[in-house]
Amino acid sequence: RDRSVSRGLGDVYKRQAYVGIAIMVGLSGIGSAYGVTIAGNASIGALKKNDSAFGNFLVLTALPGTQGLYGFAGYFMFQSIFGVLTPAITGIQAAAVLGSGIALGLVALFSAIRQGQVCANGIAAIGQGHNVFGNTLILAVFPELYAIVALAATFLMGSALAA
């Protein structure tokens, strides 16, 4: 009887953890999709005026895509490095995975969208003939920084669980 109760709780904990993983990967991917679309739309418009700057536009358009990779990296850490996504997961571990998923997912979502907007403004300026590629890259790093901080927090939380 005790085994079936603990097995039942283990299933609940696994589900809770995987909801966190889904939020982490899903929201970060959605943010990246929006961010690269915002920058990509600006690139199409800017190419009409300055088609020789396509390489710059490509780099700035791809930049918001990194947040989606951070969501996947968070999942990979919990699955492979920390090894907490197992049938023996505890309630504390599941709650930590859920919390990490919400935190990283939301930060990546919003930072990717805002980064896409920064990149789009730089793309528009480059399209008008202004030499602002380097400046745009520097300013686009600021939203990225917060996604990196959220990924680092996810790493630290996972490290604490694995210890």
Where are these regions (language model features)?
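Helix-adjacent hinge/juxtasegments
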Residues: 62-97
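Membrane-interfacial loop-to-helix junctions in multi-pass transporters
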Residues: 11-19, 52-55, 89-98, 131
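Juxtamembrane helix-loop transition segments at the membrane interface in multi-pass membrane proteins
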Residues: 33-52, 112-132
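Short alpha-helical packing/oligomerization segments
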Residues: 21, 93-116
